[in-house]
Amino acid sequence: DGLDLRFFSLDLDDLRDAGHRVGGTVNTAFVAAVALGVSDHHADSPSTGPVRVSIPISTRAADDGVGNHWTPTRVDLDVGADSEPDDVAREVLRHSAGLRDDPARSLVPVLTALPDATTAALFSAAASAHDVAASNVPRSPVLLYLCGEPVRELIPFGPLSGAAVNVTLMSYGRTAHIGISSDPAAIADPGGLAHCLQQSFTALVKGS
């Protein structure tokens, strides 16, 4: 009765190129692909509306010290069966630009001063109104070793934090690893969801 965990990988340069193609970044392509995959998975659902994605926004400045330097936010993406991958990526980019002027950013100094447990609780409460939580975990800039042997892959699995699904990206070397955590009580076909997500990443990399 625990979480369902699945993963897949793709070329990091391909994902980066997909983001650059619309003037964005790896994270732009990542969030767009997650929204597309979740939308495809729910294509036969009677419910309609935008895909609500919870994403952490970094607030760290160059001279920041230790502590929390992120704030949770939600983007509502209008994604449907006829949506072109690049168009969804452009919508993500527009939302990201708008977040820089979000009045809620004035609360960032307060959030960064809070204890980790308090910040995590706030993030969990905010995520409960989302369809999926998407996280891009910073990668190691160097090759890692364990017991003298090189680590070949790093597969990330993020907490649900109140959402039904968490999709996490961690790049290692030249590979982007995608980990999917889902609540079996909310996702009846986790294998189907993972397939839809993998297909959406492939479609975004190919372009539209």
Per-segment meaning from a language model:
Residues D1-I57:
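Gly/Ser/Thr-rich phosphate-binding loops and adjoining beta-strand/alpha-helix segments
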Residues L3-R6, D64-S140:
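Helical lid/core segments from catalytic subdomains that handle acyl or acyl-like groups
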Residues D14-R16, V22, A61, D76-S83, ...:
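A generic structural motif
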Residues F30-V38, V92, C196-F201:
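Structural preference for long, well-ordered alpha-helical segments in enzyme cores
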Residues V51, S58-D63, R174:
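Non-catalytic beta-strand/loop surface segments
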Residues D131-T202:
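Low-complexity, glycine/alanine/valine/leucine- and proline-rich hydrophobic stretches
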Residues T202-S208:
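Flexible helix-coil linker/hinge segments at domain or subdomain boundaries
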